[in-house]
Amino acid sequence: EKNKIRPRGQRDSSYYWKMEASEVMLSTRIGSGSFGTVYKGKWHGDVAVKILKVVDPTPEQLQAFRNEVAVLRKTRHVNILLFMGYMTKDNLAIVTQWCEGSSLYKHLHVQETKFQMFQLIDIARQTAQGMDYLHAKNIIHRDMKSNNIFLHEGLTVKIGDFGLATVKSRWSGSQQVEQPTGSVLWMAPEVIRMQDDNPFSFQSDVYSYGIVLYELMAGELPYAHINNRDQIIFMVGRGYASPDLSRLYKNCPKAIKRLVADCVKKVKEERPLFPQILSSIELLQHSLPKINRSAPEPSLHRAAHTEDINACTLTTSPRLPVF
């Protein structure tokens, strides 16, 4: 019965992206994140396999997961980690391109890579470009942070771990998936408060991006003076604390400083959206002396059509700080 081929017209579009567990060989365990464990694997070459923390998914969860996969498979952009397929046997899992580069978190806070200001601005632009693309596809990232941004072959940004609301949401009834404990620093106040059934929005992604921008422009994580995670949750959730902009580099352009301030506004309606964010960074780049502009990559201009299957790491990032 199982092996009978259904007429083509009756197939869910996600059917063609389903992988059999037997086809994918898992090798090294790379690390564990808020929503699952990442392995390096082989499937016609190197891939990253994320086994999601969803035990015994309900039929509703399974269908919601398939619906989301149908959206993810349509994503093709130079600044987005390529989605390659999914598995449902034993565990829900997604398969993406493998990437040898380090996460932005690792570059900034572990290796302490010394970037020049024009490079930091370009990382910010590419990240905004990738996020603008996701939002245009109506995909909310829900876990945007420096651990989920990878620098591939030098300075090409790849955003990973996007979408998958099924896994990142609380489910009523027996299935409850807790909010990520490691991502507190990047969570918008309204997400921390969790007063709405679904506090995630384009604006909550913008807030998280604002924290990434702060990391780029300060070289450190926000709230470094508060080493108590619960205190950060309380202070940010109530609107008593926001990133200290006096910590930004002295040579940080005013336009970027304003952008950080706007992105992390406590009232979500006051935050800009990615088309505006991207425009303001591009405007700034055009005003910089030519010697400080990074060489444009031809691939960036055909981003929407690019199918970049080069290797890209899903997570070589270290453990998150206690917050």
Curated annotation (Swiss-Prot):
Reaction(s) the record says it catalyses: L-seryl-[protein] + ATP = O-phospho-L-seryl-[protein] + ADP + H(+); L-threonyl-[protein] + ATP = O-phospho-L-threonyl-[protein] + ADP + H(+)
Binding of ATP, residues: 30-38, 50
Source organism (scientific name): Murine sarcoma virus 3611
Domain of life: Viruses
Location of the active site: 143 (proton acceptor)
Family named by the database record: Belongs to the protein kinase superfamily. TKL Ser/Thr protein kinase family. RAF subfamily.
Enzyme class, first EC level, given as a word: transferase
SMART domains per record: S_TKc
The protein, known as: Serine/threonine-protein kinase-transforming protein raf
Miscellaneous comment in the UniProt entry for this protein: This protein is synthesized as a Gag-Raf polyprotein.
Nucleotide-binding in keyword set: yes
Keyword Kinase: yes
Record-annotated Protein kinase domain positions: 24-284
Disulfide pattern: none
Single GO MF annotation: protein serine kinase activity
Gene from which the chain derives: V-RAF
Keyword terms, alphabetized: ATP-binding, Kinase, Nucleotide-binding, Oncogene, Serine/threonine-protein kinase, Transferase
